Amino acid sequence: KYLTEELGGVEFVDATELVDYIKAIKSPEEIERIRWSAAVHDKVYAAMPAIFRPDRYEYEITNDIRALGGELGAECIINVSIGTDPNTPVKGVVPWQYRRTKMGDKMFCLIELNGPGGYYSEALRTLVLGEPPKEYVQAADTAAKCLDLIASMMKPGAKCPDLFRANNEYLVAHGYLPEGRLFGHGQGYDMVERPAFVPAETMALAENMYVACHPGAVDGKVVGLACSNFLITKDGCERVTTTPNGLIIC
């Protein structure tokens, strides 16, 4: 305010849209670092069957994930959120609980870290110790198929309000609640960047954008989650995350 009032002879222009678009389009060097970041997540999830096992405190699991991420080159591990449930499918995340895991536990695990160079990715999976309940498998499968649907729509020119609508139509058609928040977004030096997969977003997808997409199949009792990272290509998108969607049975 001081500058606009006291600095005469200067025209102030809102360059938010310009800067957001510059940030959203990744250069070849940025894409190289993004792939490294996504690979760190994949390597951590490859180790999860050894990390998530019976008779461990939840904080021990969190610490192991953070330590492994650091050893693999993560510069900043902004978030490791886990929540286990001994009886029913996980309904959410309660970080740093002091309970021991046991057979039959289901765990929601969200990892958000950046790799060398500071570029963020994220990955979210649900894990089970032992045989998963039927409704849990169904919810996870629905979320994974919803993610596949949205991925098939992601290409240059695709509009975020259309993606948001398609996500909710699929979830509701399969008996789950519609999404009320953003279920996808750009990534880079910030964990969440534009474009945001919400009805109000005006920025369309473009080649070399890097986005995370994380639909959730929720019905008030069960939660099924899937999250992967995608690079928008000339005529579609590339799934950069290699960890399979769906449940990880440990």
Question: Which positions does each model-derived feature cover?
Answer:
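Active-site neighborhoods and metal-handling regions in enzymes and metal-associated proteins
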Residues: K1-C250
